[in-house]
């Protein structure tokens, strides 16, 4: 199924960015071969040097876009330090892209606990065993840590580590991009002065 067959209406006429994103993500779930919720997450360190990596979007609504991670990882430390981040979704099958950026907040403990319980048991063990973004002596050292935590939590529920939780990006800018012939692409950006502000829509030159 082509992008044109999936598209209904002119997205540049939309005035609701979260609703438009939901529609595009739903279409990506049909056309993408795997992980339609994969997104490039950009952060910056204390020197202003950027870092980018792929993560998985685990939820979104009018409050923002949520993902989960180890707060002691590089991205965790950078977000806690700068309290800002950016994301870029790129769906090749649809020839579409969505970029967003804004301040970041930590999700509630209740949200983090609820999501953590949905993860595979092995993934919950991994959250304890992996000292993410730190030097690893060998694969054996990681597997040993996994075995130790597997034994520790052999019975009962596996608690969520205090250093593992979620972030919510509350965008002040969301841009929708769609490929067109001769690189004359369609671009629409929604902007607001703060996460509580009203959206303004601007059509952009490609």
UniProtKB/Swiss-Prot annotation:
Its EC number is 1.4.3.5. FMN binds at residues 53-58, 68-69, 75, 97, 132-133, 177, 187. Substrate binds at residues 58, 115, 119, 123, 183-185. It is an enzyme of class 1 (oxidoreductase). Pathway: Cofactor metabolism; pyridoxal 5'-phosphate salvage; pyridoxal 5'-phosphate from pyridoxamine 5'-phosphate: step 1/1; Cofactor metabolism; pyridoxal 5'-phosphate salvage; pyridoxal 5'-phosphate from pyridoxine 5'-phosphate: step 1/1. The gene is pdxH. Keywords: Flavoprotein, FMN, Oxidoreductase, Pyridoxine biosynthesis. GO terms for biological process: pyridoxine biosynthetic process. It catalyses: pyridoxamine 5'-phosphate + O2 + H2O = pyridoxal 5'-phosphate + H2O2 + NH4(+); pyridoxine 5'-phosphate + O2 = pyridoxal 5'-phosphate + H2O2. Binds 1 FMN per subunit. Its cofactor is FMN. Homodimer. Belongs to the pyridoxamine 5'-phosphate oxidase family. InterPro entries: Pyridox_Oxase, Pyridox_Oxase_N, Pyridoxamine_oxidase_dimer_C, Split_barrel_FMN-bd. It comes from Rhizobium johnstonii (strain DSM 114642 / LMG 32736 / 3841). Catalyzes the oxidation of either pyridoxine 5'-phosphate (PNP) or pyridoxamine 5'-phosphate (PMP) into pyridoxal 5'-phosphate (PLP). SUPFAM superfamilies: FMN-binding split barrel. One of its GO terms (molecular function) is FMN binding. It comes from the Bacteria. This is Pyridoxine/pyridoxamine 5'-phosphate oxidase. It holds the Pfam family PNP_phzG_C.
